[in-house]
Amino acid sequence: MSRLVVVSNRIAPPDNKGGAGGLAVGVLGALKAAGGLWFGWSGETGNEDEPLKKVTKGNITWASFNLSEQDYEDYYCQFSNAVLWPAFHYRLDLVQFQRPAWEGYMRVNALLADKLLPLIKENDIIWVHDYHLLPFASELRKRGVNNRIGFFLHIPFPTPEIFNALPPHDELLEQLCDFDLLGFQTENDRLAFLDSLSSQTRVTTRSGKHHIAWGKDFQTEVYPIGIEPDEIALQAAGPLPPKLVQLKAELKNVKNIFSVERLDYSKGLPERFLAYEALLENYPQHRGKIRYTQIAPTSRGEVQAYQDIRHQLETEAGRINGRYGQLGWTPLYYLNQHFDRKLLMKIFRYSDVGLVTPLRDGMNLVAKEFVAAQDPANPGVLVLSQFAGAANELTSALIVNPYDRDDVAAALNRALTMPLAERISRHAEMLDVIVKNDINRWQERFIHDLKEVTPRSAERRQQNNVATFPKLA
C-alpha cells in the first residue's frame, strides 16, 4: 500500500486542541487512511540548518522545520503574500513584485525539496498544497524524484490577463506542469489555468483533462473542498455557554445578520458594510429590528493593505452607527478579534442570515459551515457572493454581486422576510450538496485520482525535458 506524503506551507501540530480548519481535517483523514508523513514549516523563524523536528502518533509522522528571517520575509511575506495572493485574487494593484523576493521564493522551495528528499520512499505518493509551493514538484524532479506528485490550489486561479502580468508567469506555468495531477476548486479556475498555459506554449489535450505541455504529461481536475457537516451540526446544537445565552436573549426581538472571516481585502468587507447601509436606507422598516454582526480578526497585520482596510472598516462602522443608530439600538457590531470556532458554529445556528460576500474566493468554507450549523426545522438564509467558489455548489443560496450594494441590500431584505417553507426548502437542497461532497469525499477523490496516475520514469522525464512546442501565435 502506498504511503501518503503531504506537503503544505504550515502543518497543524499533532497536539493542536483547537478546532481544525478545512485543510487540516482533510489531510488528517487522508493520512489516517493511508499512513504517512505531513511535512511543512513549523511557523517559527530560526536556524534552517537544524534537524527536522519529528513527532509520530499512530501511523502519522509530522516533520517540521524553521525558516531564517530572510527566507520568511522573501518567500512568505513578500512573494507568497504580496505577489501571488493579491494577483490570484485579481488585485494586481496590490502586487509588490521584487526580484529578490522571487529568488527567495525559489530558494525556499529548493530548500524544502532538499529537506524532504531523504524522507521519500519509492512508492510514496506526494500531495502538495497551495500557492506557496507552485515550483515544488519541479524541484523534486530535478532531484530525481519520479513518484506521483499531486497539487491542490485552495485559492482561485486568475485569468491569463491577470496571471501573465506576473513577471515570472512563464516559469511558474512550466513548473506547475511537473505535477502529475493539478486540482482546482472550480471549473473556472481549471480553465483559467489552461488558458494561461495555452497563451505561453502549445498544449495537447486528450480526453478533456489529460494534457501535454513543454513535453510534460499531467492531468487537471476539479475538487471542490468540503467540510465535516455532522461534526459542525453537533457543535452548533450543543449546550450554550453563559455568554451566548445572554446574547440569544438580546437577539430575541431582533433578526441577526452574521458574518465572520479574517480581515482581508479579498473578503469584500467595506463593500459589505455599504450594502448593509443600503439595506437600512432602502428598507427603513428594518431599522431597530435587525442587527448585523461582523467578526473579522486581524490577518497579516504588518502589511499596509491590511492596516488600511482595518482603519476603513472602523471608520465605516462608526459612521453607519452614528447615522442610523437609536437609543437602545446599535445597527452594526464590528469585532476585530478571534473567536473559538466551536462558539462560532453556535452563533451561526442562531443567526437569521449568513452574509458571505467575498470579492473573490477559492471556495469559502464559512458559507458551507453556516448551512451545516442551521436547525433544519427553522434555518437561516445564506446570502452568497457569485465570486465565491461555493456559489457553484450552493445554488439555493441567494446569489449576489458584491460590487452591487443595492443588489445585496435587496437580497438581505428578501432573506429577512423569507417564509419558513422556502427557508426549509433552500436549506435542505444546500445541505444535501454539502453532505454528499464533504471533506472526506474531497480527499478520497483526489487521492484516488493521484494513485491512478502512471509514475514517471527517469527515461520518460528526460525525454519530456527536451521536447518543446512553439508558443501559440
From Swiss-Prot:
Q: Which Gene3D superfamilies match?
A: Glycogen Phosphorylase B (3.40.50.2000)
Site entry (Involved in alpha anomer selectivity), positions: 85, 155
Q: Pathway it belongs to?
A: Glycan biosynthesis; trehalose biosynthesis
The EC code for this enzyme is 2.4.1.15
Sites binding UDP-alpha-D-glucose sit at: 21-22, 262, 267, 339, 365-369
Q: What is the main EC category here?
A: transferase
Catalysed reaction, written as an equation: D-glucose 6-phosphate + UDP-alpha-D-glucose = alpha,alpha-trehalose 6-phosphate + UDP + H(+)
How does the record describe its quaternary structure?
Answer: Homotetramer.
Indicate the family of this protein.
Belongs to the glycosyltransferase 20 family.
Q: What is this protein called?
A: Trehalose-6-phosphate synthase
Gene symbol of the encoding locus: otsA
